[in-house]
C-alpha cells in the first residue's frame, strides 16, 4: 500500500495539481446566542445592547474620565460625543432604537388638474399631507392614482376589437382613390335602382 502522504494528493488541475489537500481548521468553537432572552425582551434595542453590554459599560467609564463634551441620546440611552453626533443619528443602532420614525407624505408630481387628484380631494384628502390616508381608520391611499392609459373610445368594457377592421378604417385614402370609390358607389346605387324598378 501507498503511504498516507500519497493518499492525500488531490485530483485537481492547474497550479495545485500535485499539492496536498488543505484540511479546514476552525478558529474557535461556535457560541450559540440565547434566543429565548432575545424573544422575551422583544426589541432590537435590547438585543443589541445585550451583545455589547460590557463594551458599553467600559465606554461609559472612559467617557466620564474624558472631558470631551457630548450628550446622552434619549432614544439609545448611551453617551455620544459631540464630534460623532451626526454619525450616531444616521447609524443603524439609533434608527432601530427609535420607536417612531415620522413618515411624512412626500410631495408628488401630479398636477391639481388630474382626475385622481380631484377625486381624492373631494373625499377629504389633503395634498399637504397634514391628514392621514382615506378610509375609516385613515390607513387608506395617501397619493392619487396615476392614469397611464385613458380610454377615449366608445366601445364598452370586455368587448373584443377586430384589429383588421380598425386597420382598414384607419388607413387614409388619397383624393383620387376617394373619387374612384365614390363613382363605384354611384354606379352600384344606379344599378340597384334600375334592377328594382324594372320588376
Swiss-Prot record:
GO molecular function, one term: RNA binding
Signal peptide interval: none
Disulfide bonds: none
Domain G-patch: 112-160
PROSITE patterns: G_PATCH
Entry protein name: Uncharacterized protein C1604.16c
Matching InterPro entries: G_patch_dom, GPANK1
Listed Pfam families: G-patch (PF01585)
GO terms for cellular component: cell division site; cytosol; mitotic spindle; mitotic spindle pole body; nucleus
Lineage top rank: taxon: Eukaryota
Amino acid at each position: 500500500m501507498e503511504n498516507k502522504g500519497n493518499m492525500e494528493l488531490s485530483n485537481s488541475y492547474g497550479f495545485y495539481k500535485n499539492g496536498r489537500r488543505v484540511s479546514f481548521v476552525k478558529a474557535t468553537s461556535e457560541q450559540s446566542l440565547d434566543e429565548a432572552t432575545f424573544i422575551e425582551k422583544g426589541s432590537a434595542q435590547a438585543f443589541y445592547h445585550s451583545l455589547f453590554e460590557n463594551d458599553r459599560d467600559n465606554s461609559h467609564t472612559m467617557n466620564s474620565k474624558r472631558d470631551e463634551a457630548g450628550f446622552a441620546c434619549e432614544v439609545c440611552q448611551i453617551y455620544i460625543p459631540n464630534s460623532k453626533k451626526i454619525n450616531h443619528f444616521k447609524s443603524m443602532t439609533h434608527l432601530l432604537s427609535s420607536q417612531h420614525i415620522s413618515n411624512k407624505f412626500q410631495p408628488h408630481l401630479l398636477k391639481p388638474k388630474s382626475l385622481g387628484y380631484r377625486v381624492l380631494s373631494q373625499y377629504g384628502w389633503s395634498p399637504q399631507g397634514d391628514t392621514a390616508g382615506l378610509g375609516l381608520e385613515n390607513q387608506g391611499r395617501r397619493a392619487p392614482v396615476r392614469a397611464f392609459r385613458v380610454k377615449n373610445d366608445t366601445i364598452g368594457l370586455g368587448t373584443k376589437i377586430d384589429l383588421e377592421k380598425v386597420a382598414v378604417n384607419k388607413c387614409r385614402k388619397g383624393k383620387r382613390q376617394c373619387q374612384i370609390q365614390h363613382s363605384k358607389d354611384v354606379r352600384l346605387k344606379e344599378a340597384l335602382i334600375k334592377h328594382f324598378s324594372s320588376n
